[in-house]
């Protein structure tokens, strides 16, 4: 972390999402646009997404080992976030994408993962339809 913060102004992750003022500038999300994910229909869709902003996300440490995999995942949303009770999350725990086991209480979302993430990368994507505006956030973990 020190090397990155001393030598870079920003860094992008390998997770999908929309940048907002609350995101860690060294873990910025992005949607890939390339030969595999570059269809015009998809592009038109993602440029109309909005960030799903949150106060904080745990764990702060995104590097996972045998001791902390699966992680204890918690997100605290801002009080003014509407329709958060309609949130859907998906994760690639166990190396297969599936709907996450979520619990939402008073704007705090927790995910109980069924399996550990497999080496290289674990990801979580959450979205909510906020009165016709699709809001999205993603998180990634580096897995040893």
Segment roles from a protein language model:
Residues 7-8, 25:
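A generic structural signal for alpha->beta connector loops
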Residues 1-2, 23:
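Short, solvent-exposed polar/charged micro-motifs at secondary-structure junctions
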Residues 8-17:
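Acidic, His- and aromatic-enriched active-site or binding-groove loops in soluble protein domains
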Residues 3-4, 28:
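Conserved, mostly hydrophobic/aromatic
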Residues 17, 21-25, 30-144:
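Terminal accessory/targeting
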Residues 2-3, 46:
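N-terminal start-of-chain detector that recognizes signal peptides
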């Amino acid at each position: 972390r020190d090397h990155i913060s001393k030598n870079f102004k920003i860094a992008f992750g390998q997770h999908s999402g929309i940048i907002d003022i609350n995101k860690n500038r060294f873990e910025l999300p992005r949607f890939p646009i390339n030969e595999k994910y570059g269809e015009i229909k998809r592009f038109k869709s993602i440029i109309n997404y909005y960030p799903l902003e949150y106060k904080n996300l745990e764990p702060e440490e995104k590097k996972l080992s045998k001791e902390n995999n699966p992680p204890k995942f918690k997100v605290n949303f801002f009080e003014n976030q509407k329709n958060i009770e309609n949130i859907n999350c998906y994760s690639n725990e166990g190396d297969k994408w599936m709907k996450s086991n979520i619990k939402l209480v008073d704007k705090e979302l927790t995910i109980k993962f069924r399996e550990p993430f497999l080496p290289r990368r674990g990801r979580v994507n959450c979205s909510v339809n906020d009165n016709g505006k699709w809001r999205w956030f993603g998180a990634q973990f580096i897995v040893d």
